[in-house]
Regions:
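Alpha-helix N-cap/start motif
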Residues: 93-94
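Terminal transmembrane helical anchor/hairpin motif
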Residues: 41-43, 165-248
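Secretory targeting signals
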Residues: 32-73, 97-159, 178
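Transmembrane helix irregularities
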Residues: 15-17, 140, 152-153, 172
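Central hydrophobic cores of alpha-helical transmembrane segments
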Residues: 24-29, 158-170
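Aromatic- and glycine-rich beta-strand/loop motifs that create alpha-glucan
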Residues: 1-22
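Membrane-interface capping segments at transmembrane-helix boundaries
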Residues: 18, 247-255
């Protein structure tokens, strides 16, 4: 257990040395200035528009930064043979995997806290707290997905492409379902039925990220605690699947 915690500690230390948190802070400051511009341009409901813009853009920005950091960190370790060196010691592969995942999860919690503080002056604190906890779950889930993809592909470009394709599809799957069931389409056409089946299958397989970190919690007030329960449940289920897949892929590699 101490070795796992040591790997997690060095993973967090690497994030500090590569100035990831400074990058997140700079992005939040720039987006905050952009939200002020949106507030001045808007004619009505200026605060709601400012909050919505800052929340949506900050969520996408921090997810992009975290996933890119996880990918670049892991690829650098593979290329520098750091993984081989660690696994040559008395350390099981599962210990290395959980150490890295724990470190990236800690970084995700710090980034979620920073992002929530950036919104605390615009929205009620209960809504910000719910939004921040949901963002932390979303970041942890995306970090686990990126870790799995890097172990599988061992290259940044295919891994990041898959991660963001997955994220955009999971985030918009409800809208895709509505479009596939539109009354403007011919319900008897085979193409419409096939598309509907494919979309339903994807909606069953993918996590419903559209219900994560909703901007409405900030501008309309927080929902019931059951909304956070759904987020935690989805994060736990899909996080466990990603951990199992990542461990399987790591153990079958010849390192």
């Amino acid at each position: 257990m101490s070795k796992v915690l040591a790997i997690a500690q060095f993973t967090l230390l690497e994030a500090l040395r590569t100035r990831v948190l400074w990058l997140v802070l700079a992005m939040l400051m720039l987006l905050g200035l952009g939200s002020l511009f949106v507030q001045h341009v808007a004619i009505t409901e200026t605060t709601r528009l400012q909050t919505g813009f800052l929340a949506a853009s900050a969520r996408m920005a921090v997810i992009f930064v975290l996933c890119l950091h996880v990918a670049s960190s892991m690829v650098r370790e593979f290329n520098d043979k750091g993984v081989d060196l660690l696994l040559s010691l008395d350390l099981p592969r599962a210990g290395y995997f959980f150490g890295k995942l724990l470190g990236f999860a800690g970084l995700a919690l710090i980034i979620a806290a920073m992002t929530s503080l950036a919104l605390a002056w615009l929205a009620p604190l209960p809504g910000v707290a719910l939004w921040g906890m949901s963002l932390a779950c979303e970041l942890i889930l995306m970090a686990a997905l990126t870790l799995f993809c890097i172990i599988t592909f061992v290259q940044i470009m295919p891994a990041i492409s898959f991660v963001f394709g997955f994220y955009l599809l999971a985030r918009s799957i409800d809208a895709v379902k509505l479009l596939s069931g539109s009354q403007l389409l011919n319900p008897n056409a085979w193409s419409t039925k096939l598309t509907g089946w494919l979309v339903d299958a994807l909606a069953t397989i993918l996590p419903n990220l559209g219900r994560f970190t909703q901007t409405g919690w900030l501008v309309n007030g927080p929902e019931a605690i059951s909304a956070l329960g759904f987020v935690v449940l989805q994060t736990s289920v899909y996080g466990l699947l990603l951990v199992l897949a990542g461990l399987y892929d790591l153990y079958r590699k010849n390192l």
